[in-house]
């Protein structure tokens, strides 16, 4: 499993609008993507910093989304986002929710 961690800085007083845009426009796009598994988003107490983590079956699925659909997502969010979102990618090491764990290396 693979994860995309997107850090977003919102314009002032736009958290509620971001939530609406995410639910009505972005989530439907994500659900259509091959390999998409889950999305979890966090908002800071200041209401302008958001972290969105999406989980994907494979790195290739996440990269395909990043190339083909993510530019559209950035455009959709442009009215509520201040600056350019920062994207980091990771291999999922462990998830109790998805019952995933990294293989334990065998020592000879």
Place the predicted regions along the sequence by residue.
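Short S/T/G/P-rich N-terminal loop/turn motif that feeds into the first structured element of a domain
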Residues: 1-51, 55-71, 78-108
